[in-house]
A protein has these predicted regions:
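N-terminal, polar/charged subdomain of small-to-medium soluble alpha/beta proteins
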Residues: 1-89, 104-112
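A charged helix-plus-loop insertion that forms the helical arch/lid used to bind
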Residues: 87-101
């Protein structure tokens, strides 16, 4: 699995103008799933996202709290393009998990 993690003051996902999901302060995470990923990869990434110390404390000390300690939220967005490779002038996505497998895998990731 691959993740692009960004601290945000707020983030949202809209499709055709309709709000799908939103969060206040916290993290926005783009998640790519490799064709060979397993439950072990889900567990590792979930643990990493929940324990990364990316936020400051009340005393101003930077990088001292994780998303759970600071009471923030996480917005996850599935992004198969994180597993592209460049073949000449074309993008190749053969390393990304196929949609039929990745949807239940992603849902398992979200519920973890």
């Amino acid at each position: 699995m691959r993740a692009v993690v960004q601290r945000v003051k707020g983030a949202s996902v809209k499709v055709d103008g309709d709000l799908i999901s939103s969060v206040g302060p916290g993290l926005c995470v783009l998640v790519g799933i490799h064709k060979s990923d397993t439950k072990k990869d889900i567990d590792w990434l979930v643990n990493k996202l929940l324990t990364l110390k990316l936020f400051g404390d009340e005393g101003g000390k930077r990088w001292s709290k994780n998303v759970v300690d600071s009471g923030h939220e996480i917005l996850c967005v599935s992004q198969f393009t994180l597993y592209y490779s460049l073949k000449g002038t074309k993008l190749d996505f053969h390393n990304a998990m196929p949609a039929t497998q990745s949807q239940p895998f992603y849902e398992e990731f979200l519920s973890s």
